[in-house]
């Protein structure tokens, strides 16, 4: 894959739920937004955690990139492709679409 692909919320959730799935969901929203609510099992990807991601995730594993509305994730997805990741997807609609579909999220209580 030389360029990232788009993926719907339903397709992404289905991919993540497959029994033998190695797919990783990364959330690139700011720390405050991520702290308030994020998808269950999402990895918070920032400039500071990029090296950690590259050390923990094989380049062959599918990576799904999520932002707020599906715009910023496209640039981040292409960046990951350029770093050597082979299967990268930008989540259409971002976190807002994930929340609208009532998919599992971790929410700060307070």
Swiss-Prot record:
List each copy of the Rhodanese domain by range: 19-107
Output the SUPFAM superfamilies linked to this UniProt entry. Rhodanese/Cell cycle control phosphatase (SSF52821)
According to the record, the segments passing through the membrane are: none
EC code: 2.8.1.1
**From its record, what is one biological process in GO terms?**
glycerol metabolic process
The keyword DNA repair is annotated on this UniProt entry: no
Q: Where in the cell is it found?
A: Cytoplasm
The active site consists of 67
Task: Spell out the molecular function terms from Gene Ontology.
Answer: thiosulfate-cyanide sulfurtransferase activity
Sorted keywords for this record are: Cytoplasm, Transferase
> Which InterPro entries does this entry report, sorted A to Z?
GlpE_sulfurtransferase, Rhodanese-like_dom, Rhodanese-like_dom_sf, Thiosulf_sulfurTrfase
Show the Pfam families listed in the entry.
Answer: Rhodanese
Tell me the superkingdom of the source. Answer: Bacteria
Q: Which family does it belong to?
A: Belongs to the GlpE family.
Q: Describe the function of this protein.
A: Transferase that catalyzes the transfer of sulfur from thiosulfate to thiophilic acceptors such as cyanide or dithiols. May function in a CysM-independent thiosulfate assimilation pathway by catalyzing the conversion of thiosulfate to sulfite, which can then be used for L-cysteine biosynthesis.
Question: What's this protein's name?
Answer: Thiosulfate sulfurtransferase GlpE
């Amino acid at each position: 894959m030389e360029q990232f692909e788009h993926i719907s919320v339903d397709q992404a959730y289905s991919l993540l739920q497959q029994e033998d799935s190695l797919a990783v969901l990364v959330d690139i929203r700011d720390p405050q937004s991520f702290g308030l609510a994020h998808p269950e099992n999402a990895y918070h990807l920032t400039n500071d955690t990029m090296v950690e991601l590259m050390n923990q995730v094989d380049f062959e594993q599918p990576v799904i990139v999520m932002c707020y509305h599906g715009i910023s994730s496209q640039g981040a997805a292409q960046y990951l492709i350029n770093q050597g990741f082979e299967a990268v997807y930008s989540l259409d609609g971002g976190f807002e679409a994930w929340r609208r579909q009532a998919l599992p999220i971790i929410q700060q209580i307070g």
